[in-house]
Swiss-Prot record:
Name of this chain's protein: Orotate phosphoribosyltransferase
Record keywords, A-Z: Glycosyltransferase, Magnesium, Pyrimidine biosynthesis, Transferase
Leading EC class: transferase
Classification via SUPFAM superfamilies: PRTase-like
Binding-site list for orotate: 34-35, 128, 156
Alphabetized NCBIfam families for the sequence: pyrE
Gene label: pyrE
Example GO biological process: 'de novo' pyrimidine nucleobase biosynthetic process
Highest taxon of source: Bacteria
Record EC number: 2.4.2.10
Similarity field: Belongs to the purine/pyrimidine phosphoribosyltransferase family. PyrE subfamily.
Species whose genome carries this gene: Xylella fastidiosa (strain 9a5c)
Quaternary structure and interacting proteins, as annotated: Homodimer.
GO MF, one example: magnesium ion binding
Function as written in the Swiss-Prot or TrEMBL entry: Catalyzes the transfer of a ribosyl phosphate group from 5-phosphoribose 1-diphosphate to orotate, leading to the formation of orotidine monophosphate (OMP).
């Protein structure tokens, strides 16, 4: 497993962004783990997370010149990532959207650098159903930008349903042709747990969950 994947999973565990137990998801499934990026709630944690994002993005050789953060969780993630790239001596443009239309001041729903003519990387925490990210793609294209990649923290690699064996990420990539990179996946989490003696008791529940709900192909 890549060092940045291990660093991310350890960071998530230490920050309580990654928890093990029994969690009822919005889908109704009982998951043996839960991921909440809201627990990366300090400057140090967010900076460390941004380093992991940048490492994953660089490993995927993504082509972009603007980082876009969808409201709301994507905004601090995109800001932190742009700062991390500046630290690496690569100055990227930054933009994000607001969910409420502003009728005074600068107006509109977009804030930051103009999107027109830009190659845009979208950054978010996870992709669940993919509905929100499709709306972001529409916003970017309407503003004249070209989405060239999507980066998320964790890819759960779960099938949409018993009759639809694709994950939301697989369906999104097949539909749009836009690559999606994740810092880590459910497969990585399984390997991480297997390699850590203190987490050994969570391995079998995770494996059972992946066997039942996991996608057949990697994504």
């Amino acid at each position: 497993m890549s060092h940045y994947r291990q660093r991310f999973l350890q960071l998530a565990l230490d920050s309580n962004a990654l928890c093990f137990g029994e969690f009822t998801l919005k889908s109704g499934r009982i998951s043996p783990y839960f991921f909440n990026a809201g627990h990366f709630n300090s400057g140090a944690k967010t900076a460390a997370l941004a380093q992991c994002y940048a490492d994953a993005i660089d490993a995927a050789n993504m082509n972009f010149d603007l980082v876009f953060g969808p409201a709301y969780k994507g905004i601090p993630l995109a800001t932190a990532l742009a700062c991390e790239y500046a630290r690496r001596e690569r100055d990227l443009l930054l933009a994000f959207n607001r969910k409420e239309v502003k009728n005074h001041g600068e107006g509109g729903t977009l804030i930051g650098a103009p999107l027109n003519g830009r190659k845009i990387l979208i950054i978010d925490d996870v992709i669940t159903a993919g509905t929100a990210i499709r709306e972001v793609l529409r916003i970017i294209r309407n503003a004249g930008g070209t989405p060239t990649g999507i980066a998320v923290a964790l890819n759960r690699q779960e099938i949409a349903s018993e009759t639809n064996r694709q994950s939301s990420v697989q369906a999104l990539m097949a539909e749009t042709g836009i690559p999606v990179v994740a810092i880590a996946t459910l497969s990585d989490l399984l390997a991480f747990v297997e390699e850590n003696a203190s987490l050994a008791k969570f391995y079998e529940p995770l494996l059972a969950y992946k066997t039942h709900y996991g996608t057949e192909a990697s994504d």
